[in-house]
A protein has these predicted regions:
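Hydrophobic transmembrane signal anchors and adjacent membrane-proximal interface regions, especially
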Residues: 4-7, 144, 169
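Short, Lys/Arg-enriched N-terminal segments with co-localized hydrophobic residues
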Residues: 1-14
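Short acidic-hydrophobic, aromatic-tinged amphipathic segments that line or gate anion-handling sites
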Residues: 158-165
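Pre-active-site segment of Zn-dependent metallo-hydrolases
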Residues: 23-28, 35-95, 99-158
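Short regulatory "switch" loops immediately downstream of catalytic or recognition motifs
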Residues: 1, 121, 184
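Catalytic core of the metallo-beta-lactamase
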Residues: 16, 20, 26, 32-39, ...
Length: 197
């Protein structure tokens, strides 16, 4: 569960909030904030969890261009909140990923494990496709690729910037962030954004 406290200090509000994931289902938490000054902040970057090509397609369709993000704020390390971070890095995200130190440490383990599981699942799926399509049509590709691999995880982990609980810090001139212990899991935080427009 994402716990967010948003404080907006402004007379007229034109900031945009898009609820991209975890709206009609439990997994895939992603919430995009665009401030009046044009900063784009992604709150969590969760993976849809399930089996089959429908889940794969949902994870590949992010609902935003990763190259346009300024930063990611991560509430905790559960994969339905953090699992697509290496994928957005693979797709061009280059900003900072803000979280608590424990969340970063857990993400290092959990995202590595997720990459390994994807590689195993894809290997098995591709073998199944080979058996089902022994006489493939020329020029058609039936194989699938994992969303990301260990190299993508390593690149993503270099973007993590950590702050301890109850320490208020500045994301941008007009945006402050404080992590407060949520009690949800080790390192899990209520993310309090103060946006001065």
């Amino acid at each position: 569960t994402l716990r967010l406290r948003l404080i907006v200090i402004h007379r007229t509000l034109t900031m945009k909030i898009q609820f991209i994931g975890a709206t009609r289902e439990v997994t895939g938490s992603k919430h995009l904030i665009t401030t009046d000054s044009g900063h784009t902040i992604l709150l969590d970057c969760g993976m849809y969890q399930g089996k089959g090509m429908e889940t794969d397609a949902a994870n590949r369709d992010l609902g935003f261009d990763p190259k346009t993000l300024d930063c990611i704020v991560l509430s905790h390390a559960h994969i339905d909140h953090s699992g697509l971070i290496p994928y957005v890095v693979k797709m061009g995200f280059k900003g900072d990923i803000y979280c608590t130190p424990a969340t970063r440490d857990l993400c290092s383990l959990m995202l590595t494990d997720t990459a390994f599981i994807q590689e195993q699942d894809v290997r098995m799926y591709n073998k199944k496709i080979d058996r089902q399509h022994p006489h493939k049509e020329k020029g058609k590709t039936y194989k699938v690729e994992p969303l990301y691999n260990q190299n993508d995880v390593n690149r993503a982990m270099k973007l993590f910037v950590t702050y301890s609980f109850d320490r208020r810090f500045r994301l941008f001139d007009d945006v402050l962030l404080t992590f407060t212990n949520s009690g949800h899991m080790l390192g899990g935080a209520v993310c309090s954004l103060e946006i001065y427009e």
